[in-house]
């Protein structure tokens, strides 16, 4: 694939789409808005790939509260632990930018569920990044996995 300069001099090639679908804002149920910081940039002067993980972690913790999990779930019988993540970077983000982080439950299993996340620059309808987090339901007091609670199953809708 050949790269052609854009406004910033870098053009990022398209990445594979999860679920063979181009996501838009309507695909997400819960939103958190964050602003980029100068310290989020890398040597190429765009938001560093690792900064997105921090943005998504902040948003995911707010989403957990919305779903009914305690903020400090390690003190409770019903909590979560991150099992895995898959991240697709679709386009670069320049600073300063306001980021809208959309989330939704996209899949529910017996002891885990997936959270689909999209990061959108505030004036764009196509995400700059999409990610799937597999979250395992976990009892921290007993140090063991537990079944997914019904409150999570009730929040899942078809893509």
Region locations from a protein language model:
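HotDog/MaoC-like acyl-thioester-processing domains
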Residues: 18-32, 93-95, 105-159
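Catalytic strand-loop segment that frames the active site of acyl-thioester-processing enzymes
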Residues: 18-66
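Hydrophobic residues in beta-strands and at strand termini
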Residues: 34-38, 89, 137
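Hydrophobic beta-strand-centered segment that forms part of the acyl-chain substrate-binding groove
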Residues: 63-113, 128-131, 136
